[in-house]
A protein has these predicted regions:
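Active-site-adjacent substructure of cysteine-protease-like catalytic cores
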Residues: 124-158
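Active-site acidic/histidine clusters and adjacent loop/turn architecture
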Residues: 50-133
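Short, intrinsically disordered, charge-biased short linear motifs at domain edges
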Residues: 15-16, 37-43, 63-65
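Catalytic cores and adjacent binding grooves of peptidoglycan-active enzymes
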Residues: 33-37, 81, 152, 157-228
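Sec-dependent bacterial lipoprotein signal peptides
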Residues: 1-30
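Second-shell loop/turn segments in exported
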Residues: 40, 99-109, 176-184
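Bacterial Sec signal peptide processing site at the extreme N-terminus
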Residues: 24-49
Length: 228
């Protein structure tokens, strides 16, 4: 082998070796015509450790509204071994439609968020109890913001939840899309919910972030911190 070819191989494989020392980096679907399946995913041990700790602590107990489901796997690093299907929050008092598929550590945070942020905001601004959340998205194996070549979304790990509408006992409802720039009451409710959500999730994104989030609040427990 010539010295030129030897040096060329070093240049090609050295970056890959560096990636392997910091964690497995997977490129998935680079030739796919579907941008959702064209993403970069990194094997991060903390995810498995966090899930195991949640399960060992019995932080989530199956009920009529929180049920265990079969493992979600692939492609690439999508999924979780011990997902739960959540159809209501805060002890069953607030329904979630459609149901959400989430990993174990998300469930207690959603419960606390509903009980400690959304329900108090509903009583304060709406004067009626919260009864239902409209789930725009939970588990979905896709790239961030549906952009080809982006990182795997936290939705791909069942580690994110999107909420588009809040419904109340008096029959009224506030959608994120219509209410963010809606009446004073709607704006006040949604902004109090948005700001409070940042205490419970690492990343919270709404209409103020970009057009992709104009109609929902995104909340996740990923490694990046943002409240926008």
């Amino acid at each position: 082998m010539s010295s030129y070819m030897y040096l060329r191989r070093i240049r090609v494989f050295a970056p890959l070796a560096a990636l392997m020392t910091s964690g497995l980096l997977l490129l998935w679907g680079c030739s796919s015509s579907n941008p959702d399946l064209d993403f970069v995913a990194k094997d991060e041990p903390w995810r498995k450790q966090e899930e195991n700790a949640c399960l060992s602590a019995n932080a989530v107990r199956p009920t009529s509204f929180i049920q265990t489901r079969s493992a979600l796997g692939g492609p690439s690093l999508c999924g979780t071994e011990h997902p739960f299907e959540m159809s209501a929050a805060d002890g069953g008092r607030v329904s979630m439609k459609p149901t959400a598929l989430l990993r174990c550590p998300m469930i207690p945070q959603v419960d606390r968020w509903v009980a400690e942020v959304v329900e108090p905001a509903a009583r304060h601004h709406i004067g009626a109890p919260l009864t239902e959340l409209t789930v725009a998205a939970s588990y979905a194996c896709r790239s961030m913001n549906h952009v080809a070549g982006a990182r795997l979304s936290e939705h791909g790990y069942a580690n994110a939840l999107d909420i588009s509408v809040f419904k109340f006992a008096d029959g009224s409802a506030i959608s994120v899309k219509g209410g963010w720039y809606g009446s004073g009451r709607e704006r006040a409710f949604l902004r109090e919910v948005h700001d409070g959500t940042c205490r419970y999730f690492t990343t919270v994104l709404g209409p103020g972030y970009n057009a992709a989030h104009r109609d929902h609040l995104h909340l996740d427990r990923g490694p990046y911190r943002a409240c926008r």
